[in-house]
């Protein structure tokens, strides 16, 4: 074993090999020397462990020139940015793990400008005095939704927390038992309510809640009625929930604010494209609840944000809550949100320019044509290394939206000749950029719904790299 340890090259020898262009690989001369040295030391430590475990038993395999290819791969992998672009071939439009909604070009341009230049973030250009960051989006938000006033924080969970902390702290909030949803990451509505200082008063049964359940629960401690839209799941069969307009009428009669957590939220009706009818933000505002919260980065197709709209008397109270400062959005989110809201002033323009909307409303015929183009490109790029074809399939909206509806699509099927589809899927996670797809029927499949035409070339490159071509 000692002779194997002695056969390991020195750190300096490997550093020289890594930074010398004559070795036929990309050099790492631009990396900080201290970082490069640490990465080489880590690589050598791993080889020492291989020796101890008996995985290496030939001194010649430890020569610098033999180790260099795996060292280059190791350093390249560990020195690149950790937060990276990914090619989404899954067909899940609002993929929570892959960053949810893509921003429209107008929004990305606005973000770039906000990052690169000073701005009037909290400066009133009319008076030359300090202004409010919310003034850039509140009027737009009200115009699009029809609400009296609006506010934006950093996500919808924060919006719900802020609303409950402002209006309900120390009191009881009445909510249907069937609406106590988990919103992802193990965060649940009851947990958010507990943190706000409000006391939860559950009414009804899991599958059925009546107006009388709310009426009977109201007492001297009641401070609000809460309704949570179950956008991330559906109860079917023997089921009943109280319509929003009836709950609003009860709130008015008992002088209690009605809060609607709309979850995903949407400004468009998607029924013309085969999706089930979901309440739009505008229709919910029209029903008259006092406060409505919803997300900015799901069906809306904007940045991560929690949007709060409603009657001015309540929104003004929420704005004055000191917690609002801790939850406020930054200038990049603000820039992206304003640009996205401006697109919604013309709904058809929004449908064409907001990527999430464009992907959700793509027709089956269009997707079939694009799948055939992608398949043809992959056949040319991969040759005999894989069998490429197209098959019918389904996409999903994702992001906790439209949970019960599949979207028809055409999938591109890749069956590698030299490895299993599972191995191919794993290798594709290490390409640049990584390509994420689906495993179905022992094949690797890609959905063109979530791949832009300009991404077809890097998809082909990633597959060639993963197959060693």
From Swiss-Prot:
What subcellular compartments does it reside in?
A: Cytoplasm
Top-level EC class as recorded in UniProt: transferase
* UniProt xrefs under Pfam families: Se-cys_synth_N, SelA
Q: Which InterPro entries match?
A: PyrdxlP-dep_Trfase, PyrdxlP-dep_Trfase_major, SelA-like, SelA_trans, SelA_trans_N_dom
| UniProt catalytic activity | L-seryl-tRNA(Sec) + selenophosphate + H(+) = L-selenocysteinyl-tRNA(Sec) + phosphate
What cofactors are annotated for this protein?
pyridoxal 5'-phosphate
Pathway membership, UniProt: Aminoacyl-tRNA biosynthesis; selenocysteinyl-tRNA(Sec) biosynthesis; selenocysteinyl-tRNA(Sec) from L-seryl-tRNA(Sec) (bacterial route): step 1/1
Where, per the database record, does this protein carry N6-(pyridoxal phosphate)lysine? 298
Its function, per the record, reads:
Converts seryl-tRNA(Sec) to selenocysteinyl-tRNA(Sec) required for selenoprotein biosynthesis.
Q: Which family does it belong to?
A: Belongs to the SelA family.
Name of the featured protein: L-seryl-tRNA(Sec) selenium transferase
Q: Which organism is it from?
A: Nitratidesulfovibrio vulgaris (strain ATCC 29579 / DSM 644 / CCUG 34227 / NCIMB 8303 / VKM B-1760 / Hildenborough) (Desulfovibrio vulgaris)
């Amino acid at each position: 074993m000692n002779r194997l340890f002695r056969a390991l090259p020195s750190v300096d020898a490997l550093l020289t090999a890594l930074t010398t262009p004559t070795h036929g690989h990309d050099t790492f001369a631009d990396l900080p020397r201290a970082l490069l040295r640490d990465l080489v030391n880590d690589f050598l430590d791993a080889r020492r462990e291989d020796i101890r475990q008996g995985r290496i038993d030939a001194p010649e395999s430890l020569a610098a020139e033999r180790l260099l290819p795996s060292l280059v791969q190791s350093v390249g992998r560990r020195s690149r940015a950790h937060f990276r672009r990914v090619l989404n071939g899954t067909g899940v439009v609002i993929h929570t793990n892959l960053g949810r909604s893509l921003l429209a070009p107008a929004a990305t341009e606005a973000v770039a400008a906000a990052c690169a230049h000073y701005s009037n973030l909290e400066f009133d250009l009319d008076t030359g005095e300090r202004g409010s960051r919310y003034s850039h989006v509140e009027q737009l938000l009200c115009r699009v939704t029809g609400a009296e006033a609006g506010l934006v924080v950093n996500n919808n969970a924060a919006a719900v927390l802020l609303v409950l902390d402002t209006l309900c702290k120390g009191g009881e909030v009445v909510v249907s038992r069937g609406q106590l949803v988990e919103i992802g990451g193990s965060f649940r509505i009851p947990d958010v309510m507990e943190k706000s200082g409000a006391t939860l008063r559950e009414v009804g049964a899991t599958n059925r809640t009546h107006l009388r359940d709310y009426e009977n629960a109201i007492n001297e401690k009641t401070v609000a009625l809460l309704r949570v839209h179950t956008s991330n799941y559906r109860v079917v069969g023997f089921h009943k929930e109280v319509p929003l307009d009836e709950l609003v009428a009860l709130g008015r009669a008992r002088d209690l604010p009605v809060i609607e957590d709309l979850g995903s939220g949407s400004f468009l009706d998607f029924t013309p494209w085969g999706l089930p009818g979901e309440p739009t933000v505008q229709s919910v505002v029209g029903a008259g609840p006092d406060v409505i919260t919803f997300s900015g980065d799901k069906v809306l197709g904007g940045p991560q944000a929690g949007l709060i709209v409603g009657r001015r008397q309540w929104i003004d109270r929420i704005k004055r809550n000191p917690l609002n400062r801790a939850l406020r959005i930054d200038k990049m989110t603000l820039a992206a949100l304003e640009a996205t809201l401006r697109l919604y002033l013309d709904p058809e323009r929004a449908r064409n320019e907001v990527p999430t909307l464009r992907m959700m409303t793509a027709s089956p015929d269009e997707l079939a044509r694009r799948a055939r183009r992608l398949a043809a490109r992959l056949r040319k790029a991969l040759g005999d290394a894989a069998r490429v074809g197209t098959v019918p399939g389904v996409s999903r909206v994702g992001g906790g939206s439209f949970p019960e509806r599949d979207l028809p699509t055409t999938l591109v099927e890749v069956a590698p000749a030299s490895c299993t589809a599972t191995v191919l899927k794993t290798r594709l996670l290490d390409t640049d950029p990584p390509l994420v797809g689906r495993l179905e029927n022992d094949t690797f499949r890609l959905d063109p719904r979530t791949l832009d035409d300009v991404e077809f070339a890097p998809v082909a490159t990633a597959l060639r790299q993963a197959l060693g071509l």
